[in-house]
Amino acid sequence: MLLSLAIDTAFKGYLSLQNTIENDFELNGIAPLESATPTQISYIDQDKYLSNLTDSQAGAVFIRPHLLDKVPSHIQPLVVENPHLAFALLSQLFAAPCFTLTTQNPRTNNIQIGANVVIGDNVSIGEHSIIMPNVVIGDNVSIGEHCKIYPNVVIYRDSIIGNRVNIHAGSIIGCDGFGYAHTAEGKHIKIEHNGRVVIEDDVEIGANNTIDRAVFGQTLIKQGAKIDNLVQIGHNCVVGEHTLLVSQVGLAGSTTTGRNVIMGGQAGTGGHIHIGDFVQVAGRGAVGKNLPPHTKWGGHPLMELNEWMKFYVSLRRLIKKDSKKL
């Protein structure tokens, strides 16, 4: 595919190129600056990587406007406001097929279903979706169009999956939440969970996640949320639009987040807590209270991020000072 055509196709609705392509060539892939060839494209997003640009053999490179005069003459500059986004958009044109169907699926030519897939009663799967080997889909599940369900995923009954959803290998959608009542003698009596999980459009769920079904109603993952590997989401949680949950985040039951929340690795919440829009929680942050919108937090116990960083620096100084006395 010609470079110009690839950019027009990938950028539609997201970005615009701010300069003219003088050297149009047949593009065959993307690569880092260090290893890119003359038929590949790369990007540079920060000035500190300029040394890699000087020695690169890439055919073209996405750059910010202020770096235009730094591009060597043998590389076609591609000026955009967000090179990282440009690279991400173009990468979708060169994604390798994740699964090749070896036998014809009897249900429809537009759905690929791999070996050893188990599909329950009253299941609907949208066109162009891919169900990879060893997936289990329970009764009354709905899966939208252009979804990718990777090997060994289990989707429990009544779950609703939107369009363009990716669920990576080993994730469990809709298992029972952790809920028990307790007798006077100390026995734990299971509370049956009769709700469901709803995952809206354009969500990506990493490998080995667990998203628990609701006791009543639904556990909801809203549009555009991106969830890393090894994340636990408890019953009746609501994850807001375009939220990012990094690996090993844990949300206790009935936690709700606003839109565009970011939680770093191993951060966690207590139950029945609300995290406001655009909140950021640093890795291992322990959220035990509601957090207002547009704030940043960290630490255990949780405190505002600036205060936590000051506390951490002071603590290190104190430890260093005391160690000299030993």
UniProtKB/Swiss-Prot annotation:
Metabolic or biological pathway, per its Swiss-Prot or TrEMBL entry: Bacterial outer membrane biogenesis; LPS lipid A biosynthesis
Protein name, per record: UDP-3-O-acylglucosamine N-acyltransferase
Domain of life: Bacteria
Family under the similarity heading: Belongs to the transferase hexapeptide repeat family. LpxD subfamily.
Record function comment: Catalyzes the N-acylation of UDP-3-O-acylglucosamine using 3-hydroxyacyl-ACP as the acyl donor. Is involved in the biosynthesis of lipid A, a phosphorylated glycolipid that anchors the lipopolysaccharide to the outer membrane of the cell.
GO biological process, one term: lipid A biosynthetic process
Entry-linked NCBIfam families: lipid_A_lpxD (TIGR01853), PRK00892.1 (NF002060)
Leader peptide range in chain numbering: none
Keyword set includes Transferase: yes
Protein EC: 2.3.1.191
Assigned keywords, A-Z: Acyltransferase, Lipid A biosynthesis, Lipid biosynthesis, Lipid metabolism, Repeat, Transferase
Keyword Repeat set for record: yes
InterPro entries: Hexapep (IPR001451), LpxD (IPR007691), Trimer_LpxA-like_sf (IPR011004), UDP_GlcNAc_AcTrfase_non-rep (IPR020573)
PANTHER family associated with the record: UDP-3-O-ACYLGLUCOSAMINE N-ACYLTRANSFERASE (PTHR43378), UDP-3-O-ACYLGLUCOSAMINE N-ACYLTRANSFERASE 1, MITOCHONDRIAL-RELATED (PTHR43378:SF2)
GO MF terms, alphabetically ordered: N-acyltransferase activity
Enzyme class (EC, first level): transferase
UniProt-listed HAMAP family: LpxD
Catalytic residues (positions): 235 (proton acceptor)
GO cellular component entries: membrane
Reactions performed catalytically: a UDP-3-O-[(3R)-3-hydroxyacyl]-alpha-D-glucosamine + a (3R)-hydroxyacyl-[ACP] = a UDP-2-N,3-O-bis[(3R)-3-hydroxyacyl]-alpha-D-glucosamine + holo-[ACP] + H(+)
Matching CDD domains: LbH_LpxD
Organism: Helicobacter hepaticus (strain ATCC 51449 / 3B1)
